[in-house]
Structures are given as structure tokens and as C-alpha cells.
Swiss-Prot record:
Protein function: This protein is involved in the repair of mismatches in DNA. It is possible that it carries out the mismatch recognition step. This protein has a weak ATPase activity.
Protein name: DNA mismatch repair protein MutS
GO cellular component, one term: cytosol
Species for this entry: Nitrosomonas eutropha (strain DSM 101675 / C91 / Nm57)
Positions bound to ATP: 635-642
Superkingdom of the source species: Bacteria
Pfam family, one: MutS_V
Species lineage: Bacteria, Pseudomonadati, Pseudomonadota, Betaproteobacteria, Nitrosomonadales
PANTHER family: DNA MISMATCH REPAIR PROTEIN MSH1, MITOCHONDRIAL, DNA MISMATCH REPAIR PROTEIN MUTS FAMILY MEMBER
Coiled coil: none
Molecular function GO terms recorded: ATP binding; ATP-dependent DNA damage sensor activity; damaged DNA binding; mismatched DNA binding
Amino acid sequence: MTTSGNSINKPDHSAHTPMMQQYLRIKTQHTDKLLFYRMGDFYELFYEDAEKAARLLDITLTHRGSSAGEPIKMAGVPFHAADQYLAKLVKLGESIAICEQIGDPATSKGPVERQVVRIITPGTLTDAGLLEERGNSIVLTLALHHGVIGLAWLNLAAGDMRVLETSPDNLASELERLHPSEILLPESLALPVILNSFTAPKRLPDWQFDYEHAMQQLTRQFGTRDLNAFGCEELRAAIMAAGALFEYVRLTQHTATDESATQVLGHLQTLRVERPETYLRMDAATRRNLEITLTLRGEEAPTLSSLLDICATSMGSRLLRHWLHHPLRNRITLQQRLDAVSDLIGAKPGILYAGIRERLKHIADIERITSRIALRTARPRDLSGLRDSLTALPEIIKLITTSTAIAIHRFVPAMEPDTTLTQLLVHALQPVPGAVIREGGVIADGYDAELDELRALQKNCGEFLLQLEARERERTGIPTLKVEYNRVHGFYIEVTRIHGEKIPADYRRRQTLKNAERYSIPELQVFENKTLTAREQALAQEKKLYEQLLEQLADFIIPLQEIARSVAELDVLCAFAERADLFGYTKPVFTDDPALDIEAGRHPVVENQIEQYIANDIQLGAVTREGRQMLIITGPNMGGKSTYMRQTALIILLAHCGSFVPAGSARIGPIDQIFTRIGAADDLAGGRSTFMVEMTEAASILRNATAQSLVLVDEIGRGTSTFDGLALAFAIARHLLTQNQSYTLFATHYFELTRLAEEFPQAINVHVTAVEHKRRIVFLHRIEEGSASRSYGLHVAALAGVPDKVIRNAGKILAQLEQEALSKSPQQTLFETIEENAEAAPASAHPVLDYLEQLHPDELTPREALEQLYLIKSMANRIK
């Protein structure tokens, strides 16, 4: 079997030793993988594989003799510790073929027969030791048909296979959303630039993407004549991708025939189609800027996910991450989730969700255990975990059904375990089974009569040995004689050297130690043969029974998947309820009106990082007299502009996940997409400058945003000359107002943009407030109407630790520039400050100026300064 589509010319290995001939023959079938070749208690790697493994795993590279006249480079890892090395290789994007000894060394002529029994790739992980407990491993295939990109992806550990079709322009957004661990492409397809940021994609032969071949593969797996029932009959590119994906998975799971694939991949029961209108769309930049699961620095906390993820099960944690990256637009489903959260909070406040969460902690990862049962790779502890989970479910069900939380009663039917399944596991397994079946101790006593008989023979061993020891002591007169056992030498009689003259003639020496001799006698040898045979037979019988048990459990895959889904969703909703209860979140209201009305909104993550958070309102659309469409936000750096913008997006995101939101109230109209253009950095891998990245993101917004989109734009036009940047910012804002007509929050330091409010009544100027007290700036973090008068740029620089000398010099330069600006009237600027010793430009008499001359700012408190600011604003309005 090989997953590579390249034809391989069979090389001549006759000059090599028989063992190396065997190795090279197997290796030629898996040239694109590291071959873990089992030799005794080690997995060995040879030649180039050894060099690569030594480098990646930091293990020793050695030589073992020679073959065909060349030294054999080799490196190895212990069999019992292989998982930790495999996990490291998989994280580095490597694929591994596991080659085991399947022959009996005692009867083999020449090298022991070996065979690849398992292939591990980054996207097809199912072993608990290789998977991230709260993360997913996804393999994705990409096909192109008539300019349409078809995507198919599979979470093998969950049995979840999905497809969609999209445009090439949207590929980056989809990959950012799905974050695949492994990407597969046709050999003939040119590599899209976006894939440069992912682990090197693997190439598959073009024939695997053939449409007819794909249809044949998929209909056989799902037992249907066509794919109409899945709603994807028209998605030709997606079907091509799905067919190639299934072929790849079939081969990696070592199911060589279609029949065995259908049997072993039995947990792949359906093909789900994702359509653009299903989810609230977010492009790659938006997902990064909102810090949903990773901060901008690439850390896991503090993020929205880290705040909300108090899930009791790993299934719940994975589902939460999925919901956060796949916010729904289906309001019926969202209302069901919101009602469930409301009932969980309202039913005996705090008691119900806490009680459910406490019991959920005893539920194992049923989702992944079910997949391993289907793949026949489930280990004994998987099955005991499933057994314990099924026996714990009735208590959770009772807690739900006896509560007043009607909205969560819908989970009960799917969560009720099949009593036949539970009884089978209880009857078949030891209370605490052994870790691996090859060592026994897994199947319970009383489950199989033949196994019980073989075990009884072994248990009587101890009694026989005690009797033999007593008898031999009496016969030989040696009081310290011992009858013992070890794995190397089997059963033996041990006698210290001082009693050497008492050794009977029928004692046969087996081993000499420093202070003792070990012997055997015919009676002990007969018993040893009988006992060891019984042990081998018991292990073989136990292995057979375990395989039969897995076959029986495979019949329960569908109900187990339903249980897993219900438990995971209940877990997430309980987490939502706890967070909402603790942090004072409120239930959002969805409306059909084109409006966004949030009172006392807060940033869910930031408010938990600081002592006091200032809440702010936002009204856009039909709830306002002007039909507000755009807020032009001005004000100082560090004043809270970006936080205000992000909190608006996060509140909408949470609502579309079915969570309560950090606000006094929230009314949300139809939203189809969220776009952000916040911050930027060089894209060195893609060869793009900061400004190019910024403009690319802006272009995506202008092309795709609709009247139902939320657009966040922060500091557009930086990275180029002042006038170029201003012109672009002005044109982009105007386009958003007149063409896209999206809900827009537009933060800027270009004061000229505030003139848009004079031209368009749907554009409103707002600013973040700050006051200066005793030469220091105080950020009030409150959003108020009107444009800002100052940016306090030099104050922020001082707060950042810029030396005083530099700040003073900057003040003088700024004062000079401003004086020149009065005569030349170039671009206005928000970056205004007054240097104490700088000579001010002459000004004509004005009541506001007269009033300002009477004020002494250093004597005012921040509150008094704010009051004076409002008074001056009022005076200016009256004079107009």
C-alpha cells in the first residue's frame, strides 16, 4: 500500500543483507514517510530517515555495520515511549509509517516477517496520546473545477466530514477558519500563495480527484445511489475533493479494500455541506484581530476562548472553539441556545448549571472513543472510560428532567444510553482494566468460561510453588531454599552457596550468581511448560474476546455519536450560563430591523484584565433618528478607540454563538459579515509591506461588505505619505458610506475625515474623552459625540517612556509646525500640543479665548476639567 501517486521503479536490493532488503522493500512503498521499523523493543530508522529523525527528535545518530558495502546509519526510539516521539514528529508536519513484526521469531527462516500496520499523518490522528485534548486534527483536500474551489475536510477523531465550494479570493478566510493540520492538493494544481503560510501541502495523483471515481467512493461508503440526500449533487469541485480525501484516509487507515473501508470507517455516516449563508462570515484578518482563540502575539490567553472555556469535558471545549469560529445566522437555533442559557441561570440560580457541570467532569471523551471503536484502535482504558460515562449519564438526565429548565429537556432523548450497551461493557471489562490488551487483565472474570479456566490454572501456580518449596526444603534440609520466577529464566530453585554440598543429584544448574546457584528439576519444568502455555493461551483468548467486543460495540456508533454531541452542547451552554451569571452578561435580542443598539457594552476580555472598565453605548441603523451608518471615531492613542470597536464586534459574535453578551442590553439586526482593518505588520513570507497588507485588507472589505456587514477600520492610510494616506482614507470612508452602506466604525487621526459628517447625515463624529491635569493626560475611555480637539500624542509618548529631552524638543518642533500651518493652511492635524516656552501665534479676540485665558488647568481636577470642557463647547456652539 502506498499513499504516494508517484510510480516507483523497483531498485535492485540484492547486494544488501536479507534484513536490509526487507527494510528497503517496505520503505520504497512509503517514500514520503518516516518508517518506524520494529526490532525487538525499539523502533529503528535507517539511512536518510535516521538522519532526519536524529535532527528533529534530538536523538543519537549511530551506525550499525554495513550493507551493500556502505555503513548503515540508524537511530531508534524505545517501543514503550514511542508516542512522545510520534507526537513531536506530527507537530512538525511529518507522517510516519509504523512497521511491526507480525511473524514469530522462533519459527522464522531469515528476517522476521514485518508489515506496515498503521500510518500516522498530522491530519488523521485518532490516538489519545497524539491528539490535543481540546484541539482538533483536520485533514483538508482542495480541488479546482472551472474556477471554483472545492474544499473537503475531515476530523477523523470525531467522524465529521464536510464540504463547501468557494471562490479563490475567499480561500484564505476558509483556511484561517478551518486551520487544517494537513492539506492535500492534486499534482497538477499550481500552489496558491496563501498555502505558503501552512505546512507544506502533500500532492496526490490527479486520478484520485476524478469526479466519477469520487462519486463511486462516496456512494459506496454512505450506502446510497447518489449524493442528493446530502445536498451536494451540484457541487462538482467539492465532490472531487471529497473523493480524494476519502481515498487518502482509506489508505492511511490501512483499509486496502472498499469493503474493509466501509466497515472500519463506519463512523463516517454522512457528508455535511456548508454554505456561505450558514455562518456569520469573518475573514482571516478579522479572526486574528478579534483574538478569538489566539492573541496577536500567538498566545492562547487572554483570548475570548480562554475566557469562556470552563467546559467540564474536552468535547465541550472543542465544540466551543468551533462555535466561536462558526457563529450562526440561523436565529431559530440561536434562540434555542439563548433560551437554554436563560433557563440554566434561572432554575435555582447557580445550582442547576453547577450541578450539571460537576457531573460532566466524570464524562470521558465519548466522541473520540467512538471513533477509535470504529477504527478498531480503541484501548481498554477507552472502553472503561466509556462504560463509566454511560453509567454516569442517568444522574445528569435526572437532574435535567426534575428541573424547571424546559429549554434543556431536549437533550434527554439523545443522552439516554442503551442499556444493552452499558450492560455489555459492565459485564465484559475488569473494573480497572490493563492499559494494553497484549498484557492481559482486561476482560472481566465470568465473561468467558474458557478464559476463566485458563486463569484458574495460573492462579493455582502460587499454591503449587509454595507446596514445592516446602517439600524441597524438607527433602534437601536447606531452610533458605526458594522457588521463584522471572521473565528471563522462568521458574527456578535458588540455593545459597553455603548449602552447595546438599544439592540433590536431580538438580540441574540454570544460572550462577555471586552468592547463589539457580536450579531446575523435572517436576518444575513440566509445571513451567504447562503454566506458560496457559498464560499464552489466556492472552490469546483475551485478545480474541477484545476484538469481538470491539465488533459488537461498532453497532452502537450512531447512538454514541448522538450522546457525544448532546453532552458537548450541554457542556458549552452550562459554561455560557456560568460566565453570564458571574460577569453580568445579558440576553441579546435579535430583530429584523436594520439596527444595532448596544447599551453599556463592554469588552469581555479586557474588562477581566483591569480593575474598572468603562462601558459605552453604540447605536447604528434604524434605532437612530439620522439612520446612523458610520461612526467616525477620533481621540488620543490609548484612549480606547480600538477596544470600543472590538467590543462591538465581540458582542455581535457572542450573540451569534448563542451566548449572553457583556452589555446592559443589546438589540441586533441582521448581520452577515464582520470585517476588521485594525493594525498591520509586514508579511515577509508573502513579500508584502505593512502598507500593502493594509490596502489588501481594505480592498477585501470594499469588494465584499454589504449593507448588513459590520466594518471596523482603524487608522487606515498609514505607511505612506500624509496626503496619500489622507486621500485614501477619505475615499475609502466615502465608498463605505455610499456604496457598501455597511455599519462602520471608522477610527482615525486624520481630522479632515470629520468633515464627512457635514456631507453625510448618516456619518456621526464621536470621540474618546481625555483630560489634562497637571501636565498629565487622564484617559476617561468614554465615547461621546463630537470630534476630538487634541490627540495628546506627546503625552502618550511620555507615558511610553520617551526621554523628557526628546518630548520637549518634539513640543518645540510641533509648535513651529503649527505656527507655519496657520499661514499656509495645509492639512489640519490632531497632533497638537502647546509647549510651555513656545511662542504662540497671535489670535483675534474671541469670547472662548478670553475665557480660556482665565482658566488655570493645573489647578483643576479631572472632573472639573471635563466640566469646563463641556462649558467651553457650549459657548462655542452659541457663538456659531
